[in-house]
């Protein structure tokens, strides 16, 4: 379950992670002011677009279907989308699952050439006999590091990009 830090509750948008402080000196007086670090690019439709600087994981993984219901105890296919956060990344994806559930294959390899590239991997998930509930979570191992985050982008004209 997602839990937001108490300091962020009630804020209209998430504060920028990176800021820079400038100090203007006029004679003997110094005036400091702080600005967010932003990224500016040109969009053919929207014109100049300003976005906050983002520090993202090297790779993210998500399960597109947020709720899965297994009507029987037969195996069903579960898709995992792996997204590169940098160029030339490879590794293995596995599914963390509840006790008694079975996932095949246990892990799958992936290779992504470009930042932003995605690849869909399919796992067969078999629930235990009888009723059970739990969470499936994709775990990515790459270059000796473990990643378990999903990238969710909020991008609407009437809501600030987050």
Over which residues does each language-model region extend?
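Beta-strand-rich binding/interaction modules
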Residues: 1, 18-25, 77-83, 87-101, ...
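Helix-enriched interaction subdomains in cytosolic or periplasmic regions
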Residues: 120-162
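Short, solvent-exposed loop/linker segments at the N-terminal edge
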Residues: 67-74
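Short beta-strand elements
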Residues: 29-62, 146-162
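Well-ordered beta-strand positions in beta-sheet-rich domains
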Residues: 30-34, 92, 107-109, 120-122, ...
